[in-house]
UniProtKB/Swiss-Prot annotation:
PANTHER family noted in UniProt: 40S RIBOSOMAL PROTEIN S15A
Cellular component, GO annotation: ribonucleoprotein complex; ribosome
Gene (UniProt): rpsH
Keyword Ribosomal protein (UniProt): yes
Similarity-based family: Belongs to the universal ribosomal protein uS8 family.
Organism: Albidiferax ferrireducens (strain ATCC BAA-621 / DSM 15236 / T118) (Rhodoferax ferrireducens)
Entry protein name: Small ribosomal subunit protein uS8
Length: 131
């Protein structure tokens, strides 16, 4: 059976793995998932990630990050979904927790944070919020 929202599945697997204090989580890989993992690594929400090719099916393995025994990611939620896409211009991209969190946006120039999209002057689809 095909998955209707693979990005929501990625975020749910990260959330669930952190709730039970797992060190790593594996998800089926795609270009968008790798780009999201890259943004999460750059922003310091996860330690690292790598793509493993098992039997021709690439898997994205994410190493989760903890601080003082608590997950670094306190909140991770999907914004734009298959049934309700959320697009914003560069001036209307929302701030998450007054700039303490990050909105991940996919733009014509690639997947980036809300701050980088505003600085670059491009808008796009708001994929998720991370705080």
């Amino acid at each position: 059976m095909s998955m209707s929202d693979p990005i929501a599945d990625l975020l749910t697997r990260i959330r669930n793995a952190q709730m039970v204090a797992k060190t790593t989580v594996s998800v089926p890989s795609s270009k968008v998932k790798v780009a999201i993992a890259q943004v999460l690594t750059e922003e310091g929400y996860i330690d690292s990630f790598k793509v493993n090719a098992n039997d021709g099916k690439p898997e994205l393995e994410i190493v989760l990050k903890y601080y003082a025994g608590r997950p670094v990611i306190e909140r991770i939620e999907r914004v734009s979904r298959p049934g309700l896409r959320v697009y914003r211009g560069s001036d209307a991209i929302p701030q998450v927790q007054n700039g303490l969190g990050v909105a991940i946006v996919t733009t014509p120039k690639g997947v980036m944070t809300d701050r980088k999209a505003r600085a670059t002057g491009v808008g796009g689809e708001v994929l998720c919020y991370v705080a």
